[in-house]
Regions:
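Cationic, amphipathic, low-complexity alpha-helical segments enriched
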Residues: 145-156, 162
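TRAFAC-class small GTPase G-domain
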Residues: 1-148
Length: 162
């Protein structure tokens, strides 16, 4: 588990985000541990290996686990992003792709979650990964702000109707 601090300058307002990163390496034994962290977070990025059908299959299991733990995840503004990894193996090393981009997009569409695209953690194109994470964090932040404003609006309307 690593903690990373990221700042995003959005229209001159700097927002600080603390990110906790878990690399479970597809190990099912970590599922029980991470459930506790779902409750205290605002979003999660699920990453699979595009050269492994098995890795992609675990995404559905993680989604089920998130939905069981956070039954109201959509209403609460909880964001989920799916990201394909190991693009370098397909592009540079001639390894066969086991999961198409379309399959990644389809699982996102089916579950109403955000598709982050595909990348390579090995070649770590810093700008690409930074951009993916920043986009995700902006979506988390905007969704939380919109829900908060909606909540305040409802309170004010109820107050005025009394």
């Amino acid at each position: 588990m690593d903690q990373v601090k990221i700042e995003i300058n959005e229209e001159t307002h700097i927002k600080n985000f603390n990110i906790t990163l878990f690399d479970t390496a597809g190990q099912e034994r970590y599922r029980a541990i991470t459930k506790n962290y779902f409750k205290d977070s605002h979003g999660i990025i699920l990453i699979y290996d595009i050269t492994s059908k098995s890795s992609f299959g675990h995404i559905e299991k993680w989604l089920e686990s998130i939905k069981e733990t956070l039954s109201d995840w959509k209403k609460s503004g909880y964001m989920i992003m799916i990201l394909g990894n190991k693009l370098d193996l397909v592009e540079n090393n001639g390894k066969k792709r086991a999961v198409t981009s379309e399959e990644g997009k389809n699982i996102c569409s089916k579950n109403d979650i955000y598709w982050g695209g595909e990348c390579s953690a090995k070649t770590f194109e810093v700008n690409q990964i930074k951009e993916i994470i920043e986009t995700f964090l902006k979506k988390v932040y905007i969704k939380k702000v919109l829900i908060y404003k909606l909540y305040l609006n409802i309170i004010m309307q109820n107050k005025n109707n009394v």
